[in-house]
């Protein structure tokens, strides 16, 4: 039994087109998930800003919480207690949504990796090699960008699961 070369070529082109479509869709999904995550972080930052918590105060508070070292002078203790109440309230409100958005980014990143592998499997070896290098650089850039958007409590929450 012989295979018609034209039908084999059509099949390969169709597979490549389908893989490219899936890859493009995975890119759109990841971009959307990252935008949503950034938006949640920005909204949380705005909520803190609206309650007069500066980035410096938040960083100091996170250090105190992480190191389990509390301030010692009365004025700082009062400030810490007040900020702890405000920050904890905002954390409770936003960290669940941020964690869910991070899970969605992780899922979309995995789907992009699978779609990339599927697309590469439809290409000649030399082109696939070049695209693999590009995809690895792109995915590592995405991973670094996502890691930089994590807030301390959201990161701790994700690590517990």
Spans of features found by a protein language model:
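Short, charge-rich amphipathic alpha-helices with coiled-coil/heptad character
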Residues: 1-31, 35, 80-84, 88
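Extended alpha-helical coiled-coil "stalk/arm" regions
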Residues: 30-80
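Short, amphipathic alpha-helical "recognition" segments used to contact nucleic acids or chromatin
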Residues: 106-122
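Residues within the helices of the helix-turn-helix
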Residues: 126
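The alpha-helix within a helix-turn-helix
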Residues: 129
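Short, basic interhelical loop/turn and adjoining N-cap
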Residues: 132-142
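Residue-level detection of the helix-turn-helix DNA-binding "recognition helix"
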Residues: 144-147
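Short Lys/Arg-enriched helix C-cap and helix-to-coil transition segments
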Residues: 150-161
